[in-house]
């Protein structure tokens, strides 16, 4: 995902410095070209050799090191960088950058950078809330730096409060959001549904399906990385939340209907990837239904047709994409649904095909519009999501 991208990590003197070794490793695994610049104080917390081993690049500390790779190293690395993250960022280095003081390799390099720059403060709570530090952070924001707010919790000094550097995964998420994809969806409001619904039978039982939400979550993630303003309406799943998106948790088909209709009011694109129940029990027992001799019949009633409602009153400028999971007659059934529901696109797959369906990390889909039918090869669900977004963006032109 970061192949061909250069990430510069600036590490300052903080006990949290050791965590950046893991971040560097995570970035390398995503095929980024990672360079680390350390302050002299940072070397008291972690050895530069650690970063050199993990990244395969020399860790820079001394501005006047004669064994450099580039002619003017801080300038050439600044030109090479696609993103510069200072983490952990001490109060000292924050103050220097905010006030134009460039007296070491880290500060001189970041001053020469024109790429996106992120600052992740990490320090004692009283230091972080100090008006001088806060003024410096506001000044950096004014100059286009993005400040990653610290977490609150138990700090190395023994205090509890704000000042804790976020996890490596959070820092990685910020980097991915900034440079992983071209921002061709900036300004677009996209709503995607994901996961199953649960239709209550009694206080302990419900009717549901095997949807894990992986496809919908992949769509939300890739749209976010491409700059879209994403609303993810999700049933009960066991997936990590997608960062930087609005998540609306629902349980039943009725919940899903209400959430989608509300979100549709200002959406540009709606992708219905959730597996919504077509039927629900006509009666919900207030008490647990007891086992008795003989069989039991449960009367069912239709739930509201969410995408049908959207299609019947579709306004100009709204792009509607549905999903159709079938076990037989996939193309015929999906084409009927495309027309009947007044959709712009439908994504069909057969749950019986290997690599497709619920719970897998891959999918095999056929993209159907009024004018074309396109079979896509087996891909990861993130790759499928990207391919779908490509086709939606092209169709909207």
Language model features by range: what are they?
Residues 1-118, 124-213, 217-397:
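A cross-family phosphate/adenosyl-ligand binding-site feature
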């Amino acid at each position: 995902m970061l192949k061909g991208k250069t990430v510069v990590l600036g590490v300052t003197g903080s006990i949290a410095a050791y965590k950046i070794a893991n971040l560097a490793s995570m970035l390398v695994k995503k095929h980024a070209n990672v360079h680390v610049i350390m302050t002299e104080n940072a070397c008291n917390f972690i050895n530069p050799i650690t970063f050199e081993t993990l990244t395969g690049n020399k860790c820079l500390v001394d501005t006047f090191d004669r064994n450099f790779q580039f002619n003017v190293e801080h300038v050439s690395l600044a030109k090479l960088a696609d993103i510069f993250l200072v983490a952990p960022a001490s109060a000292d280095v924050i103050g220097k950058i905010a006030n134009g003081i460039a007296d070491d390799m880290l500060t001189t390099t970041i001053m020469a950078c024109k790429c996106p720059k992120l600052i992740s403060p990490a320090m004692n709570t009283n230091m972080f809330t100090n008006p001088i530090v806060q003024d410096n952070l506001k000044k950096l924001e004014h100059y286009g730096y993005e400040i990653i707010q610290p977490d609150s919790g138990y700090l190395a000094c023994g205090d509890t409060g704000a000042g804790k550097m976020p996890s490596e995964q959070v820092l990685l998420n910020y980097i991915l959001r900034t440079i992983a994809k071209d921002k061709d969806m900036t300004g677009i409001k996209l709503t995607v549904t994901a996961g199953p619904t649960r239709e209550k039978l009694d206080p302990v039982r419900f009717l549901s399906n095997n949807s894990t939400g992986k496809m919908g979550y992949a769509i939300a993630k890739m749209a976010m990385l491409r700059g879209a303003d994403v609303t993810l309406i999700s049933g009960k799943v066991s997936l990590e939340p997608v960062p930087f998106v609005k998540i609306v948790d629902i349980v039943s088909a009725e919940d899903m209907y209400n959430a989608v209709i509300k979100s549709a009011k200002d959406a540009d694109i709606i992708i219905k990837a959730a597996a919504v129940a077509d039927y629900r029990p006509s009666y919900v027992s207030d008490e647990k239904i007891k086992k008795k001799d003989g069989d039991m019949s449960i009367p069912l009633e239709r739930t509201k047709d969410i995408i049908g409602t959207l299609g019947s009153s579709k306004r100009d400028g709204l792009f509607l994409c549905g999903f159709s999971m079938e076990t037989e007659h996939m193309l015929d059934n999906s084409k009927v649904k495309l027309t009947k529901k007044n959709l712009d696109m439908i994504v069909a797959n057969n749950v019986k095909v290997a690599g497709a369906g619920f719970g897998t990390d891959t999918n095999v889909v056929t993209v159907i519009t009024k004018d074309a039918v396109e079979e896509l090869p087996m891909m990861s669900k993130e790759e499928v999501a990207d391919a779908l977004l490509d086709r939606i963006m092209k169709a909207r032109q």
